[in-house]
């Protein structure tokens, strides 16, 4: 089953929280990070768990291999689009905000072309 945009965002959020040095990411941490309600996050996490993107043990959320792959792919897209926007003269903060919106819909082919364009 293909991952949906919101699912990508949850996986990326979990991934980034661990990258920031959190030892134990819980649902409440995800709620705070993306400003969503506990019920919304719980539903999304249940779906991600059912689809084998994450595991949850004693409240601790762990990304499984395919969850990590999705998070890294989305982050790579975000960084490529943001860098491209900056390269063509868009303000850094606007570049980040716009890239966050585009990262879920851009094709692999377009992302690869952007990465070549920016020299990565």
Where are these regions (language model features)?
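Basic, amphipathic "hinge/linker" alpha-helix immediately C-terminal to the N-terminal HTH DNA-binding motif
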Residues: 59-77
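N-terminal helix-turn-helix DNA-binding core of bacterial DNA-binding proteins
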Residues: 2-36
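C-terminal regulatory/oligomerization modules of transcriptional regulators
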Residues: 97-120
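A short, conserved structural fragment
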Residues: 49-59
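Basic amphipathic alpha-helical segments that dock to polyanions
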Residues: 10, 30, 41-49
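N-terminal positioning helix adjacent to the helix-turn-helix/winged-helix DNA-binding module
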Residues: 6-10, 77, 110
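Residues within the alpha-helical elements of helix-turn-helix
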Residues: 33, 70, 87
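Key DNA-contact positions within bacterial/archaeal DNA-binding proteins
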Residues: 39, 93
């Amino acid at each position: 089953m293909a991952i949906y945009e919101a699912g990508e965002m949850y996986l990326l959020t979990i991934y980034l929280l661990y990258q920031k040095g959190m030892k134990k990411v819980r649902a409440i941490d995800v709620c705070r990070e993306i400003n969503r309600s506990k019920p919304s996050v719980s539903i999304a996490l249940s779906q991600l768990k059912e689809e084998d993107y994450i595991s949850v043990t004693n409240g601790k959320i762990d990304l499984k291999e395919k969850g990590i792959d999705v998070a890294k792919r989305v982050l790579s897209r975000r960084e490529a689009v943001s860098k491209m926007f900056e390269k063509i003269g868009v303000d850094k903060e606007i570049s980040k905000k716009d890239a966050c919106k585009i990262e879920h819909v851009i094709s692999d082919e377009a992302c690869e072309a952007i990465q070549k364009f920016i020299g990565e």
